[in-house]
Amino acid sequence: MKRLLWVDDEIDLLRPHLLFMQGRGYHVDAVSNGDDALELLRLSPYDLILLDEQMPGRSGMEVFDELRRMDARVPVVMVTKSEEDRTMTEAIGRRVADYLVKPTSPRQVLSVVTRLLEGGKIQQQLVARDFASRFRDLNAQRNLPRGWREWCETYSELVDWELRLRDAGETGLLASLETLLDDFRREFCRFVCDDYGAWVNGGPDRPPLSTDIVPQYLAPLLGEDRTVLFVIIDCLRLDQWRALMPILEPFAQVEEAQYYSILPTATPFSRNAIFSGLFPDQISERVPGWWGWDGEGSLNSFEGELFREQVRRVMGTNLPVHYEKVFDAGDGEAMLRRLPSHLAQPGVTAIVFNFVDQLTHGRSESAVLMEVARDKEALRALTRQWFERSEALVAIRDAVLRGVPVLVTTDHGSIHCHRPATVFAKRDTTQNLRYKFGDDLRAEDRSTAFSTNDERTLRFPAGRAATNYLIALEDVFFVYPTKLRQYQARYRGSFLHGGISPEEMVLPVALLTRR
């Protein structure tokens, strides 16, 4: 039985309330002053305290401060006759759990107490009930044909269910959801394999792709007298983004949409496509020597120039463009020193934050990181912990509070890979575990990869003769027959990217404006 302590100098007038709460299964102790309340609290703990704000002798606020020193965790509901904003602001500022204005009805009190003491349990029950009902519908719809819009909606809903079930502690239902997600992921991969070539070659009704971020989402915010901040958090999954939204929502209105990354879902291709508005074959034409299989990091050396050229091409004028890349705390501090001057003048400032990508890559190489970020939930938690203390949040908040709109997106996501797939190739192939380019390249099991020898399907520059392209499907990672067991053990359970999956391809793009 939950124990309540009610403190009010007019407690005799509240007998109907006390009887009502007792009839609802609560044990209620009632006292008329703060000293008696503190004495009872010293003798035994309570689950919730209802505290009158205006009492003779010690005021409710004084008693509240003493209660907090004795028990910092017990929720306190402040009850007062005052409707002044100052009183409410002071109570909220001192972190009271809730605030009631007299006269109160028994049902008002019950509602507040139930929410504070039983709310989590009730929400858990409702989430479980709602998911069980929705699960039947989703399960029946697994094999129905979907277009790109329906896939965005379906994957977005599955992400929301995962977060809600995780918050509710419904581990059993999470297992059912994971099975459902596996089935949907398989169908999504088939959908992309069938339609991707048409998307990148001018087919009708294609989704917004990496190449469309600037013209479709950023350009409407730009203008001669406008200032915009453009933030790219490298390697951010949709579920990670949704975990960050509660940090932003207290000061920003968030309008979220989704777009599709181009293939491969890796920084050299997807992020270059965002900054240039071009596919790889088009970039290669404009930047001779850009295209190569070795040294992937160098493929992103021209982002600033490509971005300036795209803004000029899309807007038809030379707007001021600033480009920043943040790899570490030193880069972040330097960026924050420059940012105020950028935000004080018209133009666009683009900032790339690499922490999440570094975390994802480093996890595969570090036993400590592998243990700390062992699954999706842990990866979300680490991402949130970083963001709360990051220069990214400082930059976004500063811009929003200045009235500068902020467009936030990512270049690709990642997927938790569990299944190795053997590939056979010559030595001159790419090193990525989710995609391979090379001569005489094939997968032992053809169902594990999207395979083509036509570079036009991926909008790649014309390469050498007999070049094959393999892109991993679902949660597969590629291994060679040599050192097979070693690489299986090393990379199984890694978060990787470069392949085809909703986790890597269906990505957030969000506009943040001041509340």
Short names for language-model regions:
Residues 32-36, 59-62:
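Acidic catalytic/metal-coordinating carboxylates
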Residues 11-29:
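Two-component/phosphorelay signaling modules centered on CheY-like receiver
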Residues 54, 86-89, 114, 119-515:
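Feature captures the catalytic ectodomains and active-site-proximal regions of enzymes
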Residues 45-50:
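Active-site beta3 strand of CheY-like receiver
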Residues 62, 83-98:
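Alpha4 helix (beta4-alpha4-beta5 surface) of REC/receiver domains from two-component response regulators
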